[in-house]
A protein has these predicted regions:
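Conserved phosphate-binding elements of NTP-dependent enzyme cores
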Residues: 1-825
Length: 825
C-alpha cells in the first residue's frame, strides 16, 4: 500500500537538494519563517509536478490551449496525485464580477428563473409556471392570446443579453461631478476658477465666456445664478473674440464656439483613448448608481419573470443565508409535474451554497461586487469552488488559507479540510496560524532562516513531536510557552493624551451608522469576524474621509463628519505586489540603486572610462546587457510547448554587459566590487560592504530593521510575498518624524511566522516612536495583544455585524462578554 509521496533532490528556488516523505490521505502542514522555502516545496515541487504530469497525459492539441507548467528542478517525485492549488492572493476581479458569478451560484439561480418562473407576455400578463419552457415550446397567454417564447437562462445574464441598456450591465454610470467643476469659488474665472477649462480645454474659453455675458473678473461665488448657469450649462454659440497671447506679443481675432463646463468634461470623456487620458478626465467624474436598473445590472425584461413572488434582482439582494431558505420552498410552490425538475435545479444550488455557508460567507448577497470583497472572502470563494465537486484522490495545496480569517471562522475551514481527507484526498497546508496547524496530522518545518539560509527541513513529525523538539521554531508557539507580549501598552487614562481622530458615518454595505474615535500616536487594531465591516470602516470610510479632509475636497457621501486636527498625511500600506514587470527590483524600489550609480560614477575606473551615473542603469544605460535589454532573462517561443523563460545566456541573469564588471568600487576595508556583483549580494552582506557610504548604508539599515536582510538587491519585486512587499513599502517611511501621519495597514501579519510577527511589532514601534498614528486591520492574536487600543466590530458578519461591539485596551475587550474576539485573547 503506497501511503506517502517521495520527493528526492528538490532544488526549486532556495531548497537545498532536500529529500522528504509526505504522507498521503492526511492533512500535512508545512511551517517555517517567511522566505524559508515553504511555498517552494508546496507549490514549486508538489503542485508543479502533480499538475504537469496530469496535463502531459492529454493530447498535444488540448495542451496547446492550456497554460503549461515547466518541469520543476527536482531529481524525482514519486506517487504524486493530480494536484489543485489555491494561491495566497486571488487576483482582484473586474467590475463585471459579483459574488454570484464568482461562486457560480447565479448560474443555478438563472436556470430556476428561466425554467420555473411565471413569465410575462408582451402585453404585461403573467402566465403560471409550465413545462413548455423546458421543452422549448411557444407560450400562449390565456388572457390575450399572445404568442411568445420564455427567456433562456442566457437572456437573464447581465454579462450578455440580459444587461441593462443604460449601464451595459455594470450597475453604475459615470456622470459629471458638479462639485469638482469649480473647486474654489473664491477665484475669478480669469484666475482659473473653472477647473476643466484649465486642464481639458484651451484657456481661450474664458474669453468666449466673457463674450457670453459673464463677468470673468469677480470671484465666482459673487456671480448671479444666471451667470453661473451659463458657465455650467450655457448653449454652444459661436462668438467673435479678440485674443492676446500671454507669453508673446501676438494678438488676433477668432470665431470660437462656447463649450460650457459640463460639456467640456463630457466631450473629453467621449474622446478618451487610454489610461492617461482617463486620468485627466477622471477627477471631474463621479460614479452613480444606474438610474434605470438601480444597480441590479439587469434589463427590464430580465427583471420581469417572478418566482415565489419575487424577481431575479430581488433574489440577488438577499443574503446567501436567506436565499438558501427561500430556495428550499421553490419546488413546493410549483405544480406537481414540475417538481422533479425543480428539485434537481435547487439541489445543485444548495450543494454549492452549503460549502460557502460552512466557510462563513452566508452574510454576502449575490449582487455584491467581487472587487469590494476582502482577500479572505475571495480566497474562501475560490476554496469553495474547488471543493464542491466530491472528488477523490486529488492533492489540494492550500497556500495560507487562514488569511483574513477570524479565529472563530477557522473552525469552518478545518471542517472543509477534514471533509476533503474523508473523501480520500490529500491536503497540503502552508500556514503559520498555530490554531490551524494544530489540525494537521503531520508537520514539516522548513528553515532555519529565510532566503539563502533556508531551504532545509529542520523537523518533521506530529504536533506533539514538534512541541518536544528544541530545534523547532514554531514548537513553543504551538505549546503556548513563547512570550508574545512585546511592547508596553498605553493605559486607559493616557490613551487620548495626544488627541484623537473622530469619524461619524452613515450606513454603507452591511455597516450601520458609526461614531468612532482613534487615539493619535497610538497603535489601534481593528478586529472582528469576517464580514463584520472592518474593511468597509477603515478602507472605505476612514481613509477616504481623511484624504478628502487633507485635500480639502468633498467628503464621501456616507461620511457625516471627520475631525482630525494636525493630520496632514494618510498612508495605506497594503500587501498588493509591487510592480508588475521584472524591471523593478528591491534596490530600485528602495532607492538604493540610484545612490549606488552615483557612487560608481565617481570611482576612478568610471572617470577613466568616461562613464556617467546614467550609464549604470540596467534599464536604459549603456552598460546594460544587450542580449536581454537588462531584464536578466529571455523568452523562447517553442512550438507546442509553453514559452520558456531562461536566464539570459550573455549576462547570466546579472542584467549587465561585460564592461560593467570592469568598473570597481573600493570600500573602507579596500575590497573592490563591481555593481553587478554588488546587486547579487543580499542586504546584510551589502551593508557590511557599504559601511562608510552614508546614504546607502542608512537605506540598507532600514531594510535590515524591517526584517528584510535576506533579500538580494537584484531580486525582482513582483516575486516577493505579500508580507515582504508590505514591509518594503515602509522602507521610505521609517526614520522620518511622522507626528502628522496616519499609517493604515490591511492585515500586515499575512504570511508571517510568529517570529516574523515580532519583527513587525518592532516596525510599528519604530513608527510610533516617531510620533505616527498606526491603524491596523488584523486577526493575529499576538498583534491584538500588543495593541494600545482595540476596536472590535461585529458581533457577527453581514447583517448581524456592522457595529462597534467594544473599544478599549485588550484587557477590556477580553472582559466584554459580547465580543467574539475577546474569547480568543
Amino acid at each position: 500500500m503506497i501511503d506517502k509521496m517521495l520527493v528526492r533532490g528538490a532544488k526549486v528556488h532556495n531548497l537545498k537538494n532536500i529529500d522528504v516523505d509526505i504522507p498521503l490521505n492526511r492533512i500535512v502542514g508545512i511551517a517555517g519563517v517567511s522566505g524559508s522555502g515553504k511555498s517552494s516545496l508546496a507549490l514549486g515541487v508538489l503542485y508543479a509536478e502533480g499538475s504537469r504530469r496530469y496535463l502531459e497525459a492529454l493530447s498535444t492539441y488540448t495542451r496547446r490551449r492550456m497554460t503549461q507548467a515547466s518541469k520543476a528542478s527536482v531529481e524525482e517525485v514519486l506517487y504524486v496525485p493530480a494536484a489543485l492549488a489555491l494561491h495566497q492572493r486571488p487576483g482582484v476581479p473586474g467590475i463585471r464580477s459579483t459574488f454570484g458569478t464568482g461562486t457560480e451560484l447565479l448560474n443555478s439561480l438563472r436556470l430556476m428563473y428561466s425554467r420555473l418562473a411565471s413569465h410575462r407576455c408582451p402585453n404585461g400578463h403573467y402566465i403560471p409556471p409550465t413545462l413548455a419552457v423546458a421543452a422549448g415550446r411557444e407560450l400562449v397567454c390565456p388572457e390575450c392570446g399572445a404568442h411568445f417564447y420564455a427567456p433562456s437562462a442566457e437572456e437573464l445574464a447581465f454579462n450578455s443579453q440580459g444587461a441593462c441598456q443604460k449601464c451595459g450591465g455594470t450597475g453604475s454610470v459615470r456622470t459629471v461631478d458638479m462639485a469638482s467643476l469649480v473647486p474654489d469659488d473664491s477665484l475669478t474665472i480669469d484666475g482659473g476658477a473653472v477647473a476643466p477649462w484649465n486642464s481639458l480645454m484651451w484657456s481661450l474659453m474664458t474669453d468666449v465666456c466673457r463674450e457670453m455675458g459673464v463677468r470673468t473678473d469677480v470671484p465666482f461665488r459673487d456671480l448671479t445664478e444666471q451667470e453661473k448657469d451659463i458657465v455650467y450649462h450655457g448653449p454652444a454659440e459661436k462668438k467673435h473674440i479678440f485674443y492676446h497671447a500671454k507669453n508673446s506679443n501676438q494678438a488676433g481675432e477668432l470665431d470660437f464656439t462656447y463649450y460650457n463646463a459640463v460639456y467640456t468634461v463630457e466631450n473629453a470623456l467621449a474622446k478618451v483613448k487610454d489610461d492617461k487620458g482617463m486620468k485627466r478626465v477622471e477627477k471631474f467624474l463621479r460614479e452613480d448608481v444606474c438610474p434605470e436598473c438601480h444597480g441590479s445590472r439587469l434589463s427590464a425584461a430580465a427583471r420581469a419573470p417572478k418566482l415565489r413572488g419575487i424577481s431575479l434582482d430581488e433574489a440577488c439582494q438577499m443574503t446567501l443565508e436567506a436565499l438558501v431558505e427561500w430556495v428550499k420552498g421553490v419546488p413546493g410552490s410549483l405544480p406537481e409535474e414540475m417538481r422533479p425538475m425543480a428539485e434537481s435545479i435547487c439541489e445543485a444550488f444548495e450543494s454549492t451554497a452549503k460549502r460557502l455557508m460552512d466557510l462563513g460567507l452566508g452574510y454576502l448577497t449575490l449582487d455584491r461586487s467581487a472587487s469590494t470583497l476582502s482577500t479572505g472572502e475571495r480566497q474562501r470563494m475560490q476554496l469553495a469552488r474547488a471543493v464542491r465537486n466530491r472528488t477523490t484522490g486529488v492533492l489540494y495545496v492550500l497556500d495560507e488559507p487562514s488569511i483574513g480569517l477570524h479565529p472563530s471562522n477557522i473552525v469552518g475551514l478545518t471542517g472543509v479540510m477534514h471533509d476533503l481527507v474523508a473523501d480520500g484526498n490529500s491536503v497540503i497546508l502552508v500556514d503559520h496560524d498555530t490554531q490551524i496547524l494544530k489540525e494537521a496530522d503531520w508537520v514539516i518545518e522548513m528553515g532555519p532562516e529565510a532566503g539563502a539560509k533556508g531551504g532545509h527541513v529542520i523537523v518533521e513529525g506530529t504536533i506533539a513531536d514538534l512541541e518536544a523538539k528544541p530545534e523547532s521554531q514554531i514548537g513553543p508557539f504551538l505549546s503556548g510557552k513563547a512570550e508574545t507580549k512585546l511592547r508596553r501598552c498605553a493605559g486607559t487614562g493616557e490613551m487620548f493624551a495626544e488627541g484623537g481622530i473622530h469619524l461619524s458615518t452613515g450606513s454603507i454595505h452591511t455597516v450601520k451608522p458609526l461614531e468612532l474615535d482613534v487615539p493619535k500616536g497610538r497603535l489601534t487594531v481593528v478586529t472582528g469576524v469576517s464580514g463584520s465591516g472592518k474593511t468597509t470602516m477603515v478602507l472605505e470610510s476612514l481613509v477616504p474621509a481623511l484624504e478628502a479632509k487633507i485635500n480639502g475636497s468633498a467628503l464621501p457621501t456616507h461620511i457625516r463628519e471627520i475631525r482630525a486636527e494636525g493630520i496632514a498625511h494618510v498612508k495605506l500600506i497594503d500587501a498588493t505586489p509591487i510592480g508588475i514587470n521584472v524591471r523593478s527590483t528591491v534596490a530600485t524600489y528602495a532607492g538604493i540603486h540610484d545612490e549606488l550609480r552615483k557612487l560608481y560614477a565617481r570611482s576612478p575606473d568610471a572617470r577613466q572610462k568616461g562613464f556617467k551615473a546614467s550609464d549604470f542603469s540596467y534599464n536604459t544605460g549603456s552598460l546594460r546587457c544587450p542580449g536581454c535589454d537588462g531584464t536578466g532573462e529571455v523568452s523562447l517561443d517553442v512550438q507546442f510547448l509553453p514559452d520558456v523563460n531562461i536566464v539570459c545566456p550573455d549576462c547570466r541573469g546579472s542584467r549587465y554587459a561585460r564592461a560593467a564588471y570592469g568598473v570597481k568600487l573600493m570600500n573602507k576595508a579596500e575590497q573592490a566590487v563591481s555593481l553587478p556583483q554588488l546587486m547579487e549580494m543580499d542586504v546584510n552582506s551589502a551593508l557590511a560592504f557599504c559601511g562608510g557610504m552614508k546614504t546607502v548604508s542608512q537605506r540598507l539599515q532600514t531594510l535590515q530593521q524591517l526584517g528584510l536582510g535576506y533579500l538580494t538587491l537584484g531580486e525582482e519585486t513582483p516575486s516577493l510575498s505579500g508580507g515582504e512587499a508590505q514591509r518594503l513599502k515602509l522602507a521610505s517611511e521609517i526614520g522620518r518624524t511622522q507626528t502628522d501621519s496616519v499609517f493604515v495597514f490591511d492585515e500586515p501579519s499575512i504570511g508571517l511566522h510568529p517570529l516574523d510577527v515580532q519583527v513587525l511589532l518592532r516596525v510599528f514601534q519604530a513608527l510610533l516612536d516617531n510620533g505616527a498614528t498606526v491603524v491596523v486591520i488584523e486577526h493575529d492574536l499576538d498583534v491584538i495583544r500588543n495593541a494600545d487600543y482595540v476596536i472590535d466590530m461585529g458581533p457577527g458578519g453581514g447583517e448581524s455585524g456592522g457595529r462597534v461591539v467594544a473599544a478599549g485596551t485588550p484587557e477590556e475587550i477580553r472582559e466584554n462578554s459580547e465580543s467574539i474576539t475577546g474569547r480568543y485573547l
